[in-house]
Every structure is written in C-alpha cells, then in structure tokens.
Amino acid sequence: PDAIEGNNTEKCDTASAAFQSENNGCVDFVGSEDEIMEQIRQLVCMLPSNNEGDVYTDDCEDDLNRACESMENMKGDPRYLLSQISDYNTFFETKADYARNMVTGLIKLNGMTVGAVANCSEVYDAEGKKAESFDKSLTAQGCNKAAEFVQFCDAFSIPVLTITNVNGLKNCMCSEKKLAKALARMTYAFSNATCAKVNLITGEAYGSAYVFMNSKSVGADLVYAWSGAKIGAMDSTLAAKIMYPEAGADEIKQKAADYEKLQDSAAPAAARGYVDRLIDPADTRKYLVAAFEMLYTKYVSEPEKKHGTK
C-alpha cells in the first residue's frame, strides 16, 4: 500500500525489491527464482554449519602461491581484486546494490571461508571498462553496511579481510546527520570482533578514515601494504600547502615530494610499526593464505560482560 502520503507506486515504489535493495540494504539480492536459489546454494556452501563449525568448508586444489598479475591496475574495484586472490576466482558479494562504495562478501583462501570488507572507488564492466566511480571516502551507509557484515562474520567465527583504499570522510548533509554514529558502529564492530582480522592497504590510507578501516589501532592482527601504497595523515600536496602557505608552485611540489618520502608512504608506516610487511601486489594471495592459516587458532579470552552499546 501507499503508506506515504502523496506517494504512489509510479512515483516511488518503496515496497519494491529494487528499492529495498538499493536504499536500505534490507534485500541482499534481487533476481529470478532460479537466480535466487543458486545464490542460496552458493551461500550455504560457504558458511560454517554453526558458530562453532570449521571455516575450512572445502578442499582446495588451486595453487596457493598463484601470482595475481595486473591487480594494481584495478585496485579501485575490489571485486576484481577479491576474485583474483580467491580460490578458483570465486567471490560471493552481499548487498551489492546498497552503499556501492563499500564492498562486502565472502571468498575462499585454501578452502577457508573469509569475509571481505573493501573500499570501492571504481566499478568496471565485463569488458574491463570503467562504468562507475565514487569518492575515496567513508559514508554513513557504507560504514553501517561494513559494521553489519563484520558482526555477521564474527558471529560465525569467520575471519575478516579488509582492503583499504580511502582518503577521508564524505562531506555532505547526510554525513553531518549520520556519519559520526555510523563510524562509531563500524569501529566498535572491528574492535569487538574476536575472529582473525587482516588488513590489506592497496592505495591511499589517509587520516582518521584509514584508522577506522581495521587498522592496528582498532584491532587488526596483521596489516599488509602494497609497496606503492600511501599511508599518512593527509595527502602530501595538501600538507605542503598547509605548512608552506607562502610558497610557489615549484616549491610546493618539492616540499610535497619531501613530505611523501618521510611521512606519506608505506615504508615510513612500516618503520613505525603500523604495517607488518610490504608486499608486491602479485604476491597478495600467498601472503593472505599464510596469514589466515597462522591466525586459524586465534583465541581471545574476553572479560565477563553483557554486551556493548553500539
């Protein structure tokens, strides 16, 4: 029924599956009956039998050391990256139509089911052409989507992989109303989760947004970074303009290069302990397989309490 005064189905069909999928994330997948049944089969095969079930749900004959070439060129679209590193290139995405700048889903690494949460700034079509682009910023919808998925994974003791490529927080009226609480919810979900947590930094990782995305500060067990990643408080050019407001364009360029070398790249972050290892993009799969195998026996002794407040 048209419960909203002045609305009708021709104007805005709020009861449609597409609306519920795209605007509030209540629907994970929209399709025909056969397509939905196939999605359910895939999901059931990837999930443990219960919260104490083994996350090794399948045997793996895929090469654990398989090199993943050309991933760096597609780092804006984590769907491509996740499918490349997963066993047999399998990636099961959840809530694909909702908060498209944050990707969530399940992959397999050596037969182990792993939950993935990733920043998304680009979407490529089947022909490899860029079809859509987003800001590299955190939004309220994206944070809520990530928080809900992390809590789901933790409930089943499914390990979580985050792929970080973010440079700030979304600046809009919606963010002013909702983002602070959404960030708190996502941060709580990461820090409260007792499952294994690994963070992979593929592009930019700037400021508070980077900290929220499963950094060591909120509980990541291991943090890997591609050698070309940029990690710091802010973009080097912006930092140079703030520190040298009277400088000309050439001097700003030089100061930005100096700042990037000292403060705004993966190597200084690794030297300070924020990153455990710098890796080549092609070697991503083998390092992640080894990381989650090492963390398979992770156990957290929690204090007696009821629950958190977020």
What are these regions (language model features)?
Residues 1-310:
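Ligand-binding clefts of soluble mixed alpha/beta catalytic domains
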